[in-house]
Amino acid sequence: MKLNLANPIVFFDLETTGINIAKDRIVEISVLKVYPNGKEEQKTIRVNPGMHIPEEASAIHGIYDEDVKDAPMFKHIARELAHYIEGCDLGGYNSNRFDIPLLAEEFLRAEVDFDMSKRKFVDVQTIFHKMEQRTLSAAYHFYCDKCLSLIHI
């Protein structure tokens, strides 16, 4: 992947116990770190959330209590993760509204400093919404690769 980067960027995705940023916890973190020279590193880390994973969440991501019972809790990997993404910009899908705030909450609970002031954030969902029209015709074309002609009688 060739990107014009001033800093490394970490694209990441979280799997969680739910969608409440203040209450829910991370059960898996997947990251793709891209360096300005094009080098890439990938990691996936399972995390014991210290709470039951609701069936509704497990039905979405396929991770159950049994899968994370021996995984480290976030507080045990927080410093290493913070060091790994130090100096990196962050990117993801819906990351500005969900993943980044939830990750920041987890760092706060673990009492690990996570400075966001010098980072850039790339939310691919925001870019997609700005680039694609929000119409039935545009959605049909995007997903079906066909033109939809709407005839009003």
List PLM regions with ranges.
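Conserved small/polar residues in nucleotide/adenosyl-binding loops
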Residues: 151-153
